[in-house]
């Protein structure tokens, strides 16, 4: 059994992931951490009778040993959580977004220094990861590309981590093949109307109630367009990816960014 603890256990994502960890036959949830729900019964919060667990306020209150920590909190809390876990020499799976490059570089160093492993993934939906992998093949033939990402109106950051990762991967692929994206726009009548830009790739963010998490990658060519789109219809779509990450990270050492790091394990 892989003994696991969960930071942000009582948040919207945390409740979904917590239930999945409890239901998994090879994973044991030994700690639910969420300072806003400290002292409450976790089984009542997520609606299950398969476990009896009191919500803890911090990692310092944990008495059980564990193998992997999972974090779905916010960037500020995750930064502290990740440092503590890596310094303990434990492995970590992180779904929290908004982490800066400076933070990520620090995590890389800590993972190596403490002979442990960490995966940070902007998106755990397998469909979203495959969308990016497909787009990586398409951009070689259609270098004129833009990204539209759409999320619920409670999402705090824009653009999404998935959109940024997509643009980074596509931009790297374009550079590898000496390709460029042409944009003739010289004047924005409304500032920002062409979206944000990562290298030559424009990213457009939409925030509306009723949305969950969606992304469309649009490629344009002579007389044609090609779109690749992923729609997350509920938070349950992230469960298979999170479980895969936990099962894989236990075998690894070092730093990994993006769930595709583990999808390609057979080629590694």
Curated annotation (Swiss-Prot):
Catalysed conversion reaction: (S)-2,3,4,5-tetrahydrodipicolinate + NAD(+) + H2O = (2S,4S)-4-hydroxy-2,3,4,5-tetrahydrodipicolinate + NADH + H(+); (S)-2,3,4,5-tetrahydrodipicolinate + NADP(+) + H2O = (2S,4S)-4-hydroxy-2,3,4,5-tetrahydrodipicolinate + NADPH + H(+)
CDD domains per record: DHDPR_N
Primary localization class, coarse: cytoplasm
Binding-site positions, (S)-2,3,4,5-tetrahydrodipicolinate: 152, 161-162
A Gene Ontology molecular function term of the record: NADP binding
A single GO BP: diaminopimelate biosynthetic process
Cellular component, GO annotation: cytosol
Location relative to the cell: Cytoplasm
Record EC number: 1.17.1.8
Family, per entry: Belongs to the DapB family.
Known role: Catalyzes the conversion of 4-hydroxy-tetrahydrodipicolinate (HTPA) to tetrahydrodipicolinate.
Protein name listed in UniProt: 4-hydroxy-tetrahydrodipicolinate reductase
Organism of origin: Dictyoglomus thermophilum (strain ATCC 35947 / DSM 3960 / H-6-12)
Gene assigned in the entry: dapB
């Amino acid at each position: 059994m892989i003994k696991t603890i969960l930071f942000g256990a009582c948040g919207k994502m945390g409740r979904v992931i917590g239930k999945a960890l409890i239901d998994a036959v090879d994973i044991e949830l030994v700690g639910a951490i969420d300072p806003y729900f400290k002292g409450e019964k976790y089984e009542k919060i997520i609606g299950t009778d398969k476990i009896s667990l009191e919500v803890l306020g911090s990692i310092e209150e944990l008495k059980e040993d564990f193998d992997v920590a999972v974090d779905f909190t916010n960037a500020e809390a995750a930064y502290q959580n990740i440092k503590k876990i890596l310094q303990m020499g434990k492995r970590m799976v992180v779904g929290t977004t908004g982490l800066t490059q400076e933070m990520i570089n620090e995590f890389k160093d800590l993972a190596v220094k403490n002979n442990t492993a960490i995966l940070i993934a902007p998106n755990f939906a397998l469909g979203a990861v495959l969308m990016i992998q497909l787009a990586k093949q398409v951009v070689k033939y259609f270098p004129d590309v833009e990204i539209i990402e759409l999320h619920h109106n409670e999402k705090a950051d824009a653009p999404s981590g998935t959109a940024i990762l997509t643009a980074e991967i596509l931009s790297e692929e374009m550079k590898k093949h000496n390709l460029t994206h042409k944009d003739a726009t010289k004047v924005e009548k409304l500032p920002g109307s062409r979206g944000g830009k990562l290298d030559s790739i424009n990213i457009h963010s939409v925030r509306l109630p009723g949305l969950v998490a969606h992304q469309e990658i649009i490629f344009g060519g002579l007389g044609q367009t090609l779109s690749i789109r992923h729609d997350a219809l509920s938070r349950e779509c992230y469960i298979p990816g999170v479980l895969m990450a936990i099962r894989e990270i236990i075998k690894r050492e070092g730093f990994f960014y993006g769930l595709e790091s583990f999808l390609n394990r057979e080629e590694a």
